[in-house]
Amino acid sequence: MKSAQINKYGSSDVIEINQNTPEPSLSSGKVLVAIKAAGVNPVDWKISEGGFQQMFPLQFPSTLGIDFSGVIKQVGEGVSPSDFKQGDEVFGQAGVISGGSGAFAEMAVANMKSIANKPKRLSYTEAACLPLVGVAAWRVLTEDMSLSKDQKILIHGGAGGIGSIAIQLAKSLGAYVATTVSASDKPFVQKLGADTVIDYKTQPFEDLLQNYDAVFDTVGGDTYRRSFKVL
């Protein structure tokens, strides 16, 4: 099968398309998936460049990729038919740092705890965009912040991968959402449900907002320090 692999840490020039990658072996608690689409995130190039090698050293050759969508071809021992079965359309994470075989391949193995059934209304491409950013946004809003109905939250970088998902999830939780974006992205985040949109290039958000319950900062730097003023 084909896969995108690296044989050493480095920038994009170390990535190779291997036409003869062995099909990944299936073990207990995992599923084998025929990949239909895969998502690309900043963490993928960070892994490729060795940014996580102290915590998660790769064994080369290593198949890249985390987010995916596809169809289950085989289930391992310990996977109940009530959870997943052959033919199920799923999406989730198959990165090697989370026990998978790498999503940038025609076939991938993923932990059953790292996947979910794909909603019928989502295409494979749409579903493959969601896992990493969706989990990150959901954990911050529900576990770290415990955001609830009628609370006010400022989300920095609302047009980005995590920010755009965070806006939608925060609105589904009943929160009032303000966000910072560039002027050209204002229509996009308004469509997502943002109640207040601030152009970060021309408007000082800390002078416009006050008494907010939470700030979700996906930007960092000086934005982080200035954000304390709105709480």
Name what the model sees in each region.
Residues V79, Q93-G157:
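NAD(P)H dinucleotide-binding glycine-rich loop of Rossmann-like/cofactor-binding domains
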Residues V79-D83, V177-F188, G221-Y224:
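Short glycine/proline-centered loop/turn elements that form peptide/ligand docking sites
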